[in-house]
A protein has these predicted regions:
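Domain-level signal for soluble alpha/beta catalytic cores
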Residues: 1-224
Length: 224
């Protein structure tokens, strides 16, 4: 009898939030639940997700992105130099998400992914993979009309610095690997069928990856 073939797999990142957490978030936004209670709900969802992941026998775990406000916009938490009328991103299932728009520089991340890694590491001894958003996705925050006194070139330079710091921070905090979410790669072909925007996205992300050694890049993957 031939042995069953083994296909190496690992989780991508996101796991649907449990009903209890969804109810807690809704209650918080309705003013019926305090911040401390919401944080407890986030912590319980995180612990439950990781425990269930452990039971699957997966060689690497994720936090399920249970505590992120969004896989794409978590770095923007707490920033005051944004407006709400940014680029609208359409997804293949028909839903859309609208990004904020940067209105002043300099650009800095409000939150880095290392905090999510530390929270997950406190729940397990198994390897953790941390998802981070790509520099190319965040580049969509810069408005077409520009920002007086803050050029697009300076914004991109600042962005590359922040994206590098996001990855390094996650690795330093104990992530076994880091996954760069680059799902806007497909979107770029809708916005620009010539492929020019896609090439620009790839070039920007490569600027970030070029700052890592070959050994370090062995711990960084890209999700498209």
């Amino acid at each position: 009898m031939y042995p069953h073939p083994v296909i190496p797999t690992e989780p991508i990142g996101s796991i649907p939030r449990p009903p209890a957490l969804l109810e807690a978030i809704a209650s918080y936004h309705a003013g019926a639940l305090g911040h401390d209670a919401l944080e407890r709900a986030y912590s319980e969802a995180l612990r439950d997700t990781i425990q269930r992941f452990e039971q699957t026998g997966s060689p690497v775990l994720t936090d399920g992105e249970q505590t992120k406000p969004s896989f794409a916009t978590y770095p923007l938490s707490g920033l005051s130099n944004l407006a709400s009328d940014g680029v609208v991103i359409p997804f293949s299932d028909g839903h859309t998400r609208q990004l904020p728009k940067l209105i002043a520089g300099p650009f800095r991340y409000g939150v880095h992914a290392e905090g999510y890694v530390r929270a997950a590491r406190a729940c397990t001894q198994l390897p953790i993979k941390q998802a981070v958003i790509s520099a190319s996705a965040i580049s969509l925050l810069y408005p077409e009309q520009g920002i007086p006194g803050y050029s697009r070139e300076q914004f991109l330079a600042d962005l590359v610095d922040e994206a590098e710091a996001d990855i390094r921070g996650a690795l330093r905090a104990g992530a076994a690997s880091v996954q760069i979410d680059f799902t806007e790669g497909r979107l770029s072909l809708k916005l620009d069928p010539t492929g020019g925007l896609l090439k620009a996205f790839i070039a920007l992300n490569n600027q970030v990856l070029d700052r890592f050694t070959e050994e370090e890049r062995g711990r960084v993957g890209v999700h498209v």
